[in-house]
Design a protein with these regions (language model features):
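Aromatic- and glycine-enriched pocket-lining scaffold segments that form the walls
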Residues: 11, 15, 47-66, 71-76, ...
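Conserved small-residue packing positions in alpha-helical repeats and bundles
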Residues: 56, 63, 106-109, 175
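Inter-helical turn/loop segments and adjacent helix faces that build the functional surface
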Residues: 1-3, 59-73, 115, 181-184
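Aromatic-rich carbohydrate-recognition surfaces in CAZymes
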Residues: 1-27, 48-52, 56, 165-181, ...
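Extended glycan-interaction surfaces of carbohydrate-active proteins
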Residues: 14-46, 77-166, 194-227
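Solenoid-repeat scaffolds in large eukaryotic assemblies
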Residues: 71, 75, 121, 186-190
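Alpha-solenoid repeat scaffolds
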Residues: 69, 135, 184-185, 204
Length: 227
């Protein structure tokens, strides 16, 4: 019921405000985001873009359910802080003081598109794709120019996992987001992602299911074959 949703959300928000909030931002420990591997102290500890977007989505829904103005205030303050600290007019930071291009911006845009205007998202995606786009139709999990970038999957060795490997779930989410922001401008990227994902599901890995990820250098089925 709506009451149960409201109660669960309220409990969750109160806990997050008490234990996981600093200067209005949500703070996570290392390895607590979906990118849960560490190489050379690269572990995403701190204040991360998609986590803030999810918090903003919680505030937005809670206001819609309760009409309690405090949630609208929480939402507006965090949104303002995000625009001030994360957006430099060209790309949206992956974390506070970390402008390393990563595809987590697409999670943020999917979870809370109100963070920026369509024109701002368009510029953000256009600039970020220069560093993340893989010609076969996927996204690298880190800037292709990063010293941590690895173009071939390293299997159970975590080296390439979130530093090169391309994850199909985030590729497809990116296609949905690009389609929403400007389907004409990003038409080629969207179609390439659809084609690559379709080919992987039908002809590679485990037929009818998406594999976990692909190497950055070429379309392949790696990781769990039925993700």
């Amino acid at each position: 019921t709506l009451y149960e949703i409201e109660s669960a959300l309220e409990k969750s928000i109160n806990g997050l405000l008490k234990y996981h909030t600093k200067a209005g931002f949500e703070v996570n420990d290392k390895l607590e985001t979906w990118m849960d591997t560490e190489i050379e102290n690269d572990n995403r500890r701190g204040i991360r873009v998609e986590i803030q977007a999810l918090r903003l989505g919680m505030y937005k829904l809670m206001f819609e359910l309760t009409q309690n103005q405090k949630y609208r205030v929480f939402e507006n303050i965090l949104k303002m802080k995000m625009k001030d600290k994360f957006w430099n007019g060209k790309i949206l930071a992956d974390g506070l003081n970390d402008f390393t291009p990563r595809p987590n911006i697409f999670i943020a845009a999917y979870a809370y598109p109100e963070l920026m205007t369509n024109k701002e998202w368009e510029a953000c995606f256009e600039n970020s794709l220069k560093n993340l786009w893989l010609d076969w139709g996927g996204l690298s999990t880190i800037d292709k120019n990063s010293p941590l970038f690895t173009d071939a999957s390293t299997g159970e060795d975590i080296k390439s996992y979130h530093r090169g490997d391309s994850w199909f779930w985030i590729n497809n989410m990116a296609a949905l987001t690009l389609n929403k922001i400007n389907k004409n401008k990003f038409k080629k990227n969207i179609q390439k992602i659809i084609d690559a994902s379709t080919a992987e599901i039908l002809w590679k890995g485990c037929i009818g299911c998406h594999a976990e990820l692909s190497s950055a250098k070429e379309l392949s089925s790696k990781g769990c074959f039925n993700q």
